[in-house]
Each structure stands twice: as structure tokens, then as C-alpha cells.
Amino acid sequence: MGFVIAVDGPAASGKGTVAGRLAALYGYPLLDTGLLYRAVGVAILDGAGDLDDPIAAEAVARALDLSALDRAEVRTRAAGEAASRCAVHPGVRAALLDLQQTFAAREPGSVIDGRDIGTVIAPHAPAKLYVTARPEVRAERRWKQLVGQGEDVAFEDILADIHKRDARDGGRKDAPMTQAPDAVLLDTSEMTIEQAFDAARRIVEDARARHRL
């Protein structure tokens, strides 16, 4: 395994932005695992399938074409909700596990963001961050993002979605979203993007120093 930077956290916490900036800084490939689950969810919806059917969802996950990650539909609000619903199925997570762990084995390193990277996908990652923010802050960020994409959505609905996704992601039996014991907590509630990135960079630099990189 190369030098893995594991970035976990709830929806709209800023982890995706932080992960992307870290990948660019160190020249490492980036895997947004949330897009995998979003792509599975979109594929199920496209086929008029049932997101709550674990067997059907697993079949879709095992047949997933990675080119689906480039579709605009995977970044919509509906895709996010679908991802959270199908991610509760152990079979779906198992189907995507090998792909994620193969990515984590890349040399000289990689950046992977998601909800169970530091606990399940790459538990021995030398650099682990758990990026979070208050639900109201995350809801406002997501609301502004969706409005900017042309979606007509109320802030209150987004906040309700955030609470539901947090409960679902943290309460699932298989690989629940939780901070790894050795992950550094990064609360971005009062931070700008630059401040969050700078804090994350310092966390990673400390880890690199411990590993003499």
C-alpha cells in the first residue's frame, strides 16, 4: 500500500473539496467513493428498480461501469439520497470493496474520500482525517450548491435530508460512518475553503513527517 490519505465525514462537510486539493498538492490519484454509491443509485433508478432491495442493488453494484461516475446525474440531490439508501446494503458495499482497496494499494499514494475509508477501506492509512461541520452549515452549503446548479429546492428540505442521511449513514449495521480512533477531527463549520485546506495540509504533513516522506 502506498501513502493513503483517508478523508471521511458526512455529506457537505467539505471533505470532497479538501480531498481534491490534497490530491492536487501531492500529485496523488483521487477516488471519491461517494460517486460509486451515487452511480449505483442512479443505475437502479434508471432501471426503475427498488433502492431498498438488497439483492437487486448488489447486482447493479457488481455490474457497475466506472464511466457512469462521469455522468452529470450522479451529482444531483436525488443521486445523493439514492446513494445513502443503497449503501446500507452489505452486498453493495462488498461489491465495491475490492475496487476501493485496489485503488488504495496504488504507489506512491492516493487520496480517498468517503465515509468508511479510515475504518474499513484503508484502516492502516498513515493519514486519516474526519472532516465535519454542523448540520445547519452543511445544509446551507449543499443548498447553495444545488441552487447554483439550477435546482429549485428549499433550505428546510435540504436540512431534513442532511439529518436523515446522517442517521442512515451512522446507523447502518455494516461499515457505519464513524470517526476512526486515529483520525484527526477537522471541523470546518467556521472555516473558509482555504482555511480548511491549510488545516488538512498540516495534518497530512505531520503524518508524512512521521513516515519520513
Swiss-Prot record:
UniProt lists the gene as cmk
One of the record's GO molecular function terms: dCMP kinase activity
Keyword GTP-binding present in the record's keywords: the answer is no
Q: Which SUPFAM superfamilies match?
A: P-loop containing nucleoside triphosphate hydrolases
Report keywords, A-Z. ATP-binding, Cytoplasm, Kinase, Nucleotide-binding, Transferase
Entry's InterPro entries? Answer: Cytidylate_kin, Cytidylate_kinase_dom, P-loop_NTPase
For this protein, the record's NCBIfam families field holds: cmk
List GO terms (cellular component aspect).
cytoplasm
Q: Which CDD domains match?
A: CMPK (cd02020)
Organism the protein comes from: Caulobacter vibrioides (strain NA1000 / CB15N) (Caulobacter crescentus)
Supply one GO BP term.
Answer: pyrimidine nucleotide metabolic process
What name does this protein carry?
Cytidylate kinase
Location relative to the cell: Cytoplasm
Q: Which reaction does it catalyse?
A: CMP + ATP = CDP + ADP; dCMP + ATP = dCDP + ADP
EC numbers for this chain:
2.7.4.25
Grouped into one coarse class, the protein's main location is: cytoplasm
Q: Where does ATP bind?
A: 9-17
Q: Which family does it belong to?
A: Belongs to the cytidylate kinase family. Type 1 subfamily.
